[in-house]
Amino acid sequence: MRMRTPRLPVTRRQFARLLGGAGLACALPRIRAATTVGGPIVFQNTAPANGLDFVLHNDAAGRKYQVETVLGGLGVIDFDGDGWPDLYCVNGAALPSLEKSNPRFLNRLYRNNRDGTFTDVTQKAGVQGRGYDMGVAVGDYNNDGHEDLLILGVHGNTLYRNNGYGTFSDVTEAAGLNVQASGHKLWSVAAAWIDYDNDGYLDLIVSNYCDWTPGEDPVCGGLDPSERAYCHPDKYRAEPVQVFHNNGDGTFTEVSAKAGLGNLLGKGMGIAVADYDGDGLPDVFIANDNDRNMLIHNLGGGKMKEIGMQAGIAYNGDGRQISGMGADFRDFNGDGLPDILMTGLKNETFELFRNNGKGSFDDASANSGVLALSRPWNGWSCGLVDLDNDGLLDIFIACGGLDTNEPQPNRVLRNLGARFVDVSAGAGPDFAIPRVHRGVAFADFDNDGRIDAAVSSINGPVELWMNRTPMRHWLQLKLKGTHSNVSALGAKVICHGSESAQVAFVANSTGYACTSDLRVHFGLGEDRKVFLEIHWPSGIFQQIKDVACDQLLVIEESKSSSH
């Protein structure tokens, strides 16, 4: 285990230059709006022929247990450290027992064979799961260079420590992550690894949903079993947001109250992380299901404050709460400030909140075209990702109804600079296949510079949408912290091209109950060389000049700041 390293100071000039929220927006050249639409964004589903034979089972049998509707997390993890993204698939369990003894309910880990195929290594790795699982979070919590797995589930989470030789160990109890609330078991959906105090060790923020017990599940719809329906979230009590501090010795301590979030309750779903105000501290957005959304502002010194109402993200543009599901926290309009994407259910809205650089957000859903495009769809996991490598972040959304009788196709919205257009119809001959989709995790699974998408669907096969969009230039970065956490979560990268700049944070908690690739991806369009600025969580500032395009570059944190 790596020893703690003293923090190196960053100069006031460097801090102002890189971290000033409004200042950064002014200093960075804006990315130009696309004046012409390039070739189509095209995908090809290569599963299950490629070895990804996972099927998500919810054990629904007409009883309408609430947990049946909201599982489906996927996690991208390079568990063997070979530079090729592997895939972890979360699964359900038997109802009402929540037992996983039947092999069809096991979670699955698939190793990337580097040739377009995958191999199921679940049994050897020892990561089958323990119960009715929901989501997954990936991060190197003990800084040993091996990515670990946190599995979120109903009435119990599981921490798998990566042993570094193809196996994992269940260290949940030893790590102190079996903490529940007020004497009852929690239903966790998602979590984010986040070094909120920048001490070099990854802490945890856990998004819990509602108070649910199989034997006490209310009956909704008609009294006849054939008329039963899934209950509205209002039928259930909200649950607390949990914060766990990494003690640096392999254990965690719950510090929710100490951090200032002791009374923060919600019906938490998707969780996403970015430094929205440019103070060098990671902040957290949590989408809530028919409850106000949360923006957890990191105040420093181990303190946090929920400011969703003040920041303008608690409700949609009409002042209404919606069925918040998936979330992402990235810069869609190229002004250097991270914005928020949130999905909802049909006849609600997908929300796009634009960071105005003044500590709050404006609802950009209507002006961007996202509002009109979202009405017919039930959106779950999602992501702001550059699918055509033009330097603009597009939107990918996993869609599907609450019930298995309402399958829907996934959606792709192309970013034209000032607005989005739905290009799903041209995304490939099999892209329109409807299923009850839930999770989506993003990675360049074949390392060709184009971002691919793995998608889960309830009682259906996992889909692996390989990106076949016509090639443009690109750059991917794998950051390795030395003074900062090894995963480099929270680092900010500024990529300067010939006429524009892009800002990205190392953040892998995306969408709904999912984890995407830790690597930072930039679409470069026609640029062949770029200039990089990296601000590490430790405060170290690093510059790299004349970086060639079309490569995966591994960057280790420098010993001191460069000028």
What are these regions (language model features)?
Residues M1-Q14, G21-C26, A34:
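N-terminal secretory signal peptides
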Residues V10, A34-T69, L106, Y110-G131, ...:
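Blade-edge motifs of beta-propeller repeat domains
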Residues G39, A60, A372, L402-H563:
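Gly/Ser/Thr/Pro-enriched helix-cap/hinge segments flanking short amphipathic alpha-helices
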Residues L71-G81, D133-N143, S188-N198, L202, ...:
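Beta-propeller blade termini
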Residues L87-N91, D148-G153, L204-N208, V284-N288, ...:
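Hydrophobic beta-strand segments that make up the repeating blades of beta-propeller
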Residues N91-R104, C210-K235, A398-N405:
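Short, conserved, GDST-rich strand-edge loop motifs in beta-rich repeat architectures
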Residues E99-F105, H155, D234-E239, N290-D291, ...:
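Short, solvent-exposed loop/turn segments at conserved positions within beta-propeller repeat blades
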Residues A259-G391, I395-P409:
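Beta-propeller domains
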